[in-house]
């Protein structure tokens, strides 16, 4: 194919967008970027009753968060109705489409008779004009649907980039309804006109659309358009092995942001959820674009693995800039009752984040761990009784004296701890646990020397001395 590459993401704004949906944006985006082509966003909003601006906003927000920038759009199908009607009129004029007056009740009865006879239920062409055929008299007051005059013979063939060569006999296809009685065009028709007008060269979409493809190819051929390359992606399954969907508990794309995931981790994970580049598990957005091709798209359903995504997110958190993580942590801290004023009273948030991030799988976990630096500790009485015993109090007093005299560095604090342990013949947990409780209010912290340095000498000394008083 010598045409400049043009791909598209064409969601229907009828609900929230989950990872399985957004993967159908990621791959065409990556292919367009790889081929120096154009990525088009088209909003297929012809289902007026179910479409909503809220769903459109969710699509745009999710794409923006993941960095899936589009070159053209968003293009709304509802704003192209005049164009669809123009093409419908041309098809009627050329005999490519015809009015059909068969009612829904008549069609249901026909299909029931066909099922009883062991035949495939389908429209039988009652109103299809043929040479020498006498059509029924149109019923008074009935508005017809418009049907596409599908070829009666031959085969629809395409080389799917995922499924390989696909052949469908035209005998399997009936004459598709392309416009409702009120003149509103049907999805399969609008898609063809859009892809043709927009010069789409590659359609990368879920394989739930594969049954539409032969019908769309036939309409496209009838209109004189050039069929694109199709790549039908296998389904994304949830952790229970069911198709990923809202009904089966799928999270929206933005719910991952709100849970503390980084967009680069989600993009990396999604890229591997149906495509591979050798054994590479971790790669940048730039590497993904450089490596992406249609030949290595998976042919089997991909199963979502939350633990794998969490592992990737932990990796990207460790690699992330502390200042960036600090800004991302602020909304989570605010939700935990730690506002900017509280943060200003404690150690620099960048430094706190730098300490906490090596143990975290999400930004939310970083924020939860960081709260100890911005709250007055309130250790539980049982924990105090267990760890701050009469036997350890002399060691705590000596540690305070050593910390008052030490340089306030991680190395000096570590040396003071070790000297106190040796002098009192204690093991690290016997001293570190009560110190953590008294200073931080919890026994679960990163390395004790690093934590104490961040709290600052005055806070550490005053809190331990208050417990010994």
From Swiss-Prot:
ATP binds at residue 246. It catalyses: tRNA(Glu) + L-glutamate + ATP = L-glutamyl-tRNA(Glu) + AMP + diphosphate. A motif ('KMSKS' region) lies at residues 243-247. It comes from the Bacteria. It is found in: Cytoplasm. It holds the Pfam family tRNA-synt_1c. It is an enzyme of class 6 (ligase). Monomer. Catalyzes the attachment of glutamate to tRNA(Glu) in a two-step reaction: glutamate is first activated by ATP to form Glu-AMP and then transferred to the acceptor end of tRNA(Glu). This is Glutamate--tRNA ligase. It comes from Burkholderia cenocepacia (strain ATCC BAA-245 / DSM 16553 / LMG 16656 / NCTC 13227 / J2315 / CF5610) (Burkholderia cepacia (strain J2315)).
């Amino acid at each position: 194919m010598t045409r400049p590459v043009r791909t598209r993401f064409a969601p229907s704004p009828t609900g929230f967008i989950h990872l399985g949906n957004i993967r159908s944006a990621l791959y065409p985006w990556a292919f367009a970027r790889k081929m120096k082509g154009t990525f088009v966003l088209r909003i297929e909003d012809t289902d007026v009753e179910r479409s909503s601006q809220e769903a459109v906003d969710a699509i745009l927000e999710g794409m923006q968060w993941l960095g899936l920038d589009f070159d053209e759009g968003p293009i709304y199908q509802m704003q192209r109705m005049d164009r669809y009607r123009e093409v419908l009129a041309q098809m009627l004029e050329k005999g490519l489409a015809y009015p059909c007056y068969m009612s829904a009740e008549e069609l249901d009865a026909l299909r029931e008779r066909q099922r009883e006879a062991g035949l495939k239920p389908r429209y039988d062409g009652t109103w299809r004009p043929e040479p020498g055929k006498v059509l029924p008299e149109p019923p008074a007051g009935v508005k017809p649907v418009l049907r596409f005059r599908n070829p009666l013979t031959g085969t629809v063939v395409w080389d799917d980039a995922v499924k390989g060569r696909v052949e469908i006999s035209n005998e399997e296809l009936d004459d598709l309804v392309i416009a409702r009685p009120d003149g509103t065009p049907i999805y399969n028709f609008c898609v063809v006109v859009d892809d043709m007008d927009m010069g789409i060269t590659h359609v990368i979409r879920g394989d739930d659309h594969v049954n539409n493809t032969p019908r769309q190819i036939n309409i496209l051929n009838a209109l004189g358009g050039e069929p694109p390359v199709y790549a039908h992606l296998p389904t994304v399954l949830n952790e229970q092995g069911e198709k990923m969907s809202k009904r089966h508990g799928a999270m929206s794309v933005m719910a991952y942001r709100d849970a503390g995931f980084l967009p680069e981790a989600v993009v990396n994970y999604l890229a591997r959820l149906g495509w591979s580049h050798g054994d590479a598990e971790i790669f940048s957005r730039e590497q993904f674009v450089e490596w992406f091709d249609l030949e290595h798209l998976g042919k089997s359903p991909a199963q979502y693995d939350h633990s794998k995504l969490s592992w990737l997110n932990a990796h990207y958190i460790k690699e992330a800039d502390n200042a960036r993580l600090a800004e991302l942590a602020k909304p989570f801290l605010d939700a935990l009752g730690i506002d900017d004023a509280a943060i200003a009273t404690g150690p620099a948030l960048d430094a706190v984040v730098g300490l906490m991030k090596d143990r975290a799988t999400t930004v939310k976990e970083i924020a939860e761990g960081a709260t100890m630096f911005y709250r007055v500790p309130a250790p539980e009485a049982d924990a105090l009784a267990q760890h701050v015993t009469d036997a350890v109090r002399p060691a705590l007093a000596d540690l305070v004296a050593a910390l008052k005299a030490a340089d306030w560095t991680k190395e000096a604090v570590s040396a003071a701890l070790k000297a106190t342990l040796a002098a009192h013949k204690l093991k690290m947990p016997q001293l570190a646990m009560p110190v953590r409780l008294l200073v931080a209010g919890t026994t679960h912290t990163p390395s004790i020397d690093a934590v104490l340095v961040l709290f600052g000498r005055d806070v550490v000394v005053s809190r331990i001395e208050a417990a010994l008083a």
